Amino acid sequence: MKKILIALLVCFSFVTANAKDYSKYYQNLPVQMQQPTLPSIPDNHVSILECGGNGDGLTMNTQAFAKAISKLNKMGGGHLNVPAGIYLTGLISLKDNIDLHLEKNAIIVLSEDKNDHFKIDKTTGKKENRATPAINASKRKNISITGEGTIDGNGEWWRPVKRSKVSDVEWKEFQSMGGTLNEKGDIWYPFNLKHKPNVAENMDEQEKTRTHMIRFTSCENVLVQGVTLLNSPKFHIIPTRCKNVIIDGITVKCPWNAQNGDAIDISSCKDVLIVNNVIDAGDDGICMKGGAGAAGVAAGPCENINIQDNTVYHAHGGFVIGSEFSGGMKNIVVRNNTFQGTDTGLRFKSAVKRGGTSENIYIDHIYMTDIKDAAITFETTYFDNHVGAKKQTAPVKQEFLPNFQDIHMSDIYVRGCETGIEAHGAEGMVHDITIKNSNIFYTKEAKDIDATCKIQLENVRFESFAK
């Protein structure tokens, strides 16, 4: 009897992180999906203040976070509580069974000093070549970031800026930080800043060190819930090769012109739920990736992805597949989402050496207003126009071709877009696509679809202003 009581106490000492019933999102789906498993977090609590943390906006808290995580790890895991305050920090590396919990008015601010964001190579003793995502975990189980607080990525200290994307006043503000212009004088780099050191020998090499705000790699049972992610140096959150991921009720916001300012990117993950999020991003809103070439194939597909009840304001695309998806896309449901003011709504982009095959993609009840370009677009010659990029003119080996197929859309409602449906690609790259029971109000062109692209329309109504 005593042994049974002890076992019960152990069981009850674990709490499923912010337990919430997500079963409603798995009813009446067009494909069978496994509902993600929530992380199980022990009911232990450690405050960052207990471990030397200070939310005065001046004190570096990197060691305090590390100490708190180590303390919880020795206890078998638990909740790292961050109370109201401003906590300047470098890297935060989560371990098994740990919840990083930000209370209301708690703000984690990533240090402006780039040196604070590099790990040291244990073999060479030297700084690694690329910065580590500020909040990171690798091969961990049962991890979460929850609460009502904010994580501020201080991205302007990392990102290059194109002159064409800022006002005269903004351009002067960036130059007042110091920095370096390219030869043409139309791109500003945060290199040779007035108050912070460089981490590379030149601006191009330093740009290669820029990385994401949150990245979980090969992790299982992941929850990100309630927090605000602000102004990342690159992507805001990118789970990669993870299983059982839930992203629920977060807000993601960065300047509309933030270079590579993707909000939520999912890369080669399985069993993922993305719900109730609000996004205003500088690049893609909710994006599915699957790696490029052989590496993408090895990583595997994005599989069993459920995306519902999200709102995307500015973004290059509301929901996006690509550009790299050589590992494939399989069993994806996108339902009851709103896109307002995005460049494109539903965007499928890829290119030779980046492409893969899509299977069982179902999209329905999407509501769009004020879409700048095309409401629905397929692009198979995508060029990654990152800062300093140059288009390749030499012949490219025809491998890992895009194969957008088995994509089914219905109840798509659009009030305001330049082009309704746009599709370009060689024979066999865009086929077996259906769009049904939809209304699209456009301003320039209803359809711009190559003859090689096989898209079947049924009960799709196009309207525009009277001419």
Question: In which residue ranges do the predicted regions lie?
Answer:
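Extracellular "leader-to-stem" segments immediately downstream of a signal peptide or signal-anchor
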Residues: 2-81, 86-99, 103-218, 223-225, ...
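Short, small-residue-enriched loops and turns at beta-alpha junctions
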Residues: 54-56, 293-297, 327-328, 354
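Short glycine/acidic-rich loop motifs that flank beta-strands on beta-rich extracellular proteins
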Residues: 77, 91, 111-112, 154-158, ...
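Conserved short loop/turn motifs at secondary-structure junctions
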Residues: 82-89, 263-265, 351-352
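Active-site-proximal loop/turn and secondary-structure-junction residues that shape catalytic pockets
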Residues: 86, 241-243, 251, 270, ...
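Right-handed parallel beta-helix
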Residues: 104-105, 141-149, 220-230, 243-255, ...
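Extracellular beta-rich repeat passengers
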Residues: 325, 336, 345-467
